[in-house]
Amino acid sequence: MGTIDISYLSLGIGLLLLLIPLFYIWKFKTGLLRATLIGTARMIVQLFFIGVYLKYLFLWNNPWINFLWVIVMILVASQTALARTQLKRKILLIPISVGFLCSVVCVGMYFIGIVLRLENVFSAQYFIPIFGILMGNMLSSNVIALNTYYSGLKREQQLYRYLLGNGATRTEAQAPFIRQAIIKAFSPLIANISVMGLVAFPGTMIGQILGGSSPNVAIKYQMMIMVITFTASMLSLMIRISLASRKSFDAYGKLRPVMVEKKVKSKP
């Protein structure tokens, strides 16, 4: 039995469910109504666009076009990470982009080439979905980690300088802040891994089962998706912090102004 298609009429009926959260958002005057409507509209337009684009990506199955698509995803993810953490693009755009690129390529290629043993590692059927899953799942944890790391450094500069003044290397002085970033960013992911299959069925597994794969195949893919996501997220963070530290600190170890200061409007 193949996957049951959702007609456009059925899709419209399904979208009516949004009226429930929209009602409560409006009723309690949260101020989120406009943002929710815009976000939903963007999601619909973007997904339809991606659906059309992916159709031709799979049809052409060209390695160069596939890799170009991954580069576009990395640039968008880097810009999103910078925007969500309020970090300066001039200083951190390259470290963040390189962190995404290196981790996604290394871990993604390891999975496709060594674990799946595909002859054509750039096959659109596997290359695009795997890299897309990695990018999507890495983004939130990396945003939390970057925000925690730089906010901690900015808030606890005296501790950082104290450690440097007492003979610690720059790497040793940064260790407490990296530790906090890892704890805050990866604790939810670890908790999610520990209850996988008991409390929640992940989207990848459900998608494969709906697509006709056996539960055993879907389970093994889901295991690997969690492993490669966890690994790529950690590798990306370490690469990013290592590269960013060269621009984030001056010759004396002082943190440069890497975060965009929010302007406070003065009252008339």
List PLM regions with ranges.
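Short cytoplasmic-facing helical segments at TM-TM junctions of multi-pass membrane proteins
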Residues: T148-A181
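Structural signature of hydrophobic alpha-helical transmembrane segments
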Residues: I4-L16, W60-L75
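Loop-to-helix entry region at the N-terminal start of transmembrane alpha-helices
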Residues: I6, S10-I13, I65, I91-A145
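Hydrophobic alpha-helical transmembrane segments of polytopic membrane proteins
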Residues: N216-S245
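Non-cytoplasmic
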Residues: A191-N216, K220, S236
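C-terminal ends of transmembrane helices
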Residues: P21-G31, A77-K88
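Transmembrane alpha-helices
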Residues: A173-V199
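Loop-to-helix transition at the N-terminal end of transmembrane alpha-helices
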Residues: G31-Y53, F58-V70
